[in-house]
């Protein structure tokens, strides 16, 4: 009797062992995102951002970003453009280390700058994204007024599990993470 049970128990046992060894692999492939710390942002974002042919000072206290479990960031900071040729053209510097679509604008890993103009009605911003090195425009997205009362922030990049929004003042643009 025990000889007949052995093959019947070994095969299912082996199958369960194989499945249990694959579970950690599947869990490891799921990427989680969290808010980046001030120290992480300070080590990632430059004190002077390379924008076209200039190095424009950044205001680190406005830095915001997210980081995934693989150490890839999406982070930005306000540019201090007074006195530079970028004045009135760009307001923020953005580093993207994983593909992302911001309000319909697809951004590959790289460095970008963006600026905005307010809609005539005042309820939206037209946000234009440019490559930081060349100034070439990548696309334009619309940031909408955040409904209700919210904290006004120069820049806040929310983790996707919370809101999947990039907040600029009282306005926000939704984003979607892409695959690398």
Regions found by a protein language model. Give the residues of each.
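N-terminal secretory signal peptides that target proteins for export/translocation
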Residues: 1-7
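A short tyrosine-centered beta-strand micro-motif
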Residues: 108-117
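Primarily secretory-pathway and cell-envelope proteins
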Residues: 26-85, 133-180
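Conserved interaction-surface patches within small, structured recognition/assembly domains
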Residues: 91-101
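Extracytoplasmic
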Residues: 72-74, 87-91, 107-109, 122-124
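Compact nucleic-acid interaction/catalytic patches
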Residues: 116-137, 144
